Amino acid sequence: MLQLSNVSKLFNPGSADEKIALIGINLTLKPGDFVTVIGSNGAGKSTLMNIISGVMTPDAGEVAISGETIHHLPEYDRSRWIGRVFQDPMAGTAPRMTIEENLAMAYTRGKKRGLSFGTNARRRALFLEQLQRLGIGLEDRLRAKVGLLSGGERQALSLLMATFTQPQILLLDEHTAALDPARAELITRLTEEIVREMKLTTLMVTHNMEQAIRLGNRLIMMDKGRIILDVSEERKKDLTVEQLLGEFENISGSKLSDDRVVLG
């Protein structure tokens, strides 16, 4: 489904600020895989997401979806295959537009330019049906400006918009990190439900180690631009946070020092 082959990315090459962001990344996700990604700041997690989504292009290597090479395509063209939810609830939606208008925009994502963002009765009924699935009352606020929503409501809408046209790949970039615990748990539950029901192939970056172990069928750990650990579903079932920390120390030769990494 998703394949990265020898992907590398270098920032500020040839300067005093040169930094290796990714080096020789090889990663394959099978259809329906839900892979969590853990690692400290600077490990390369966000760069990995940006290269898959088209925000950045790799300096070397290839990115392919369902056998089709896409690393040369801009972000807009990839949106027909890829949905993404960001850490910032303000990203991914248009605050001055209504919920209905945002959903109309998501509905046309990846389709030919010039397609109307307008809404007819059939499309509105579809929007209402999808909003009801969230279970937080947004179906009763279809014409409310998105900028008036709470962070949790907005992130729930972002999740719905990212999955509205059932993308082949769903990228979740620390999408619960900016929320309070109750809202974070709500978005996590909605994520699990949507991914399971739609059988979405998903890559989720998180700083919460307990969450990384609990969610999905596979876990990868990154450090200094490399994938240093790849945990299968069978092994993941019995993995503890303490064991995961120990694995990191054994492989990297250092302790996980990022204060943002949450143990559970």
Language model features with spans:
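H-loop/switch region of ABC-family ATPase nucleotide-binding domains
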Residues: 206-207
